A protein has these predicted regions:
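Flexible beta-alpha connector loops of hexameric P-loop NTPases
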Residues: 1-5, 37-40
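A short, charged, Gly/Pro-tolerant segment at domain boundaries
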Residues: 150-160
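A structural preference for short, pocket-lining loop segments at secondary-structure junctions
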Residues: 8-33
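A broad, low-amplitude sensor of folded, mature protein cores
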Residues: 14-17, 26-27, 76, 110-112, ...
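Conserved mixed alpha/beta catalytic, RNA-binding, or beta-rich assembly cores of soluble enzyme
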Residues: 3-10, 44-45, 51
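Short amphipathic alpha-helical "recognition" segments used for binding
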Residues: 12, 48, 158-160
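Conserved catalytic cores of soluble enzyme domains
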Residues: 31-148
Length: 160
């Protein structure tokens, strides 16, 4: 869940990316805001979104893991330059119980899977976990042509 600690970690990561002029890669998996923290938890949506927006031209890649719900979906994760989902991951603003309570019926299971969300324009790619390292590496290389691949990085990628 996203509370003040997670919000602070995302903000600090974005600030470090800016200082180092390095891409920000986030892999959220969250059921939403930590409601027991009250308004402080909800404030993290604005804080993390503002931090991600300050990245400017620095690449921001988000890999939505299962599940990615609520405040995370509606904040820093949704404004990445490239948004990837893992196959079958549940990605939506409201959880199943909230949807069921609002609609007074059960939401279909296939609604709001990564594939459904991609079809409706919220994701750029759906990539299996075993292919993520190479895919994210290629994306970052494309978005940051000034970063020269080093033999260490190339060797690491070859091992995957």
């Amino acid at each position: 869940s996203m509370g003040t600690a997670v919000g602070e970690a995302i903000v600090a990561s974005a600030e470090l990316a800016i200082l180092q002029e390095a891409p920000l890669i986030v892999i959220p998996s969250s059921g939403g805001a930590r409601m027991q923290e009250g308004i402080l938890s909800l404030m993290q949506m604005a804080r993390t979104t503002a931090a991600a927006a300050r990245l400017g031209d620095i690449p921001h890649v988000c890999v939505m893991a299962d599940p990615t719900l609520a405040g995370v979906t509606a904040s820093f994760a949704a404004i990445a330059d490239v948004i990837i989902g893992e196959p079958g991951a549940t990605i939506r603003f409201a959880g199943s119980r909230v949807v069921q309570g609002a609609l007074r019926r059960r939401a279909p299971v296939e609604d709001h899977t990564a594939e459904w969300v991609q079809k409706h324009g919220m994701l750029d790619l759906v990539v299996p976990r075993r292919e993520l390292r190479e895919t994210v590496s290629r994306i970052v290389s494309h978005l940051t042509p000034s970063i020269v691949a080093t033999p260490v990085i190339e060797a690491e990628i070859a091992q995957t």
